[in-house]
Regions:
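Structural scaffold positions in well-ordered secondary structure
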Residues: 1, 19-21, 65, 88, ...
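Metal-dependent active-site segment of extracytoplasmic phospho-/sulfohydrolases and closely related
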Residues: 1-34
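Extracytoplasmic/secreted proteins, especially bacterial periplasmic and envelope-associated proteins
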Residues: 3, 12, 45, 87, ...
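Surface-exposed helix-capping loop/turn segments at secondary-structure junctions
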Residues: 3-16, 94-103, 182-194
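Intrinsically disordered, low-complexity polar regions and short flexible loop motifs
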Residues: 159
Length: 194
């Protein structure tokens, strides 16, 4: 990355070039490769305080780093805006004045990407391998799947590590989020029920 950024500097392109650095999923250690990752990780926690890893619907598997650099426009800052990689399409299309099919899942969160708003998406369906999660505001809902027969609900504002399932404590919130999730899924033609 350093070489790439230095090349932009050398070519005089830094100020007007958008650079995005992100990942496709959270960390993974025990993935079947004989790389000794589990033994070598020691006390290090690759996902920090987040629970889970790649292939899980916990934030450790789906909350990923996202850095955007555009020196002429975006001032250095940290943001907690809720954004998603698929929103790059709609956001860059808006930035460039380009139209795109409105049936896509991409939504413009351009103001958040440019540091002009602390608010991004309101909600997001996250799909993994045979499992889903639904995020809305401070809430994360993980519907039942495979070996998990019960719905999981987490208040991320109070429990970023997703250690305390509060589904039984907030049945109305579970119903609200489940109904929204099912409606969104149905609108895409997905037949999977939980």
């Amino acid at each position: 990355m350093d070489e790439f950024l230095n090349t932009l500097d050398a070519l005089g392109l830094t100020e007007n070039t958008i650079v995005v650095l992100t990942s496709d999923n959270g960390p993974v250690l025990d993935d079947g490769y004989k790389d000794r990752a589990v033994e070598l990780v020691g006390e290090h926690r690759p996902a920090g305080p987040l629970r889970g890893w790649k292939t899980t619907m916990y934030d450790g598997g789906v909350r990923i780093p996202f850095m955007l650099r555009w020196p002429a426009v975006v001032k250095p800052q940290v943001s907690d805006a809720f954004v998603c990689q698929m929103d790059l399409l709609a956001s860059f299309a808006k930035l460039l004045g380009v139209t795109y099919p409105d049936k896509l899942d991409s939504r413009s969160t351009l103001k958040a990407f440019l540091g002009k708003s602390k608010k991004g998406r309101e909600a997001l369906v996250i799909e993994g391998m045979f499992n889903y999660a639904y995020r809305k505001g401070d809430w994360a809902l993980i519907p039942p799947y495979r070996n998990h027969p019960h719905c999981l609900l987490y208040n991320l504002k109070e429990d970023i590590g997703q250690q305390h399932n509060v589904a039984e404590k907030y049945p109305d919130k579970v119903k609200e989020l489940t109904d929204e999730f099912e409606a969104l899924k149905e609108s895409t033609g997905k037949k999977t029920k939980f």
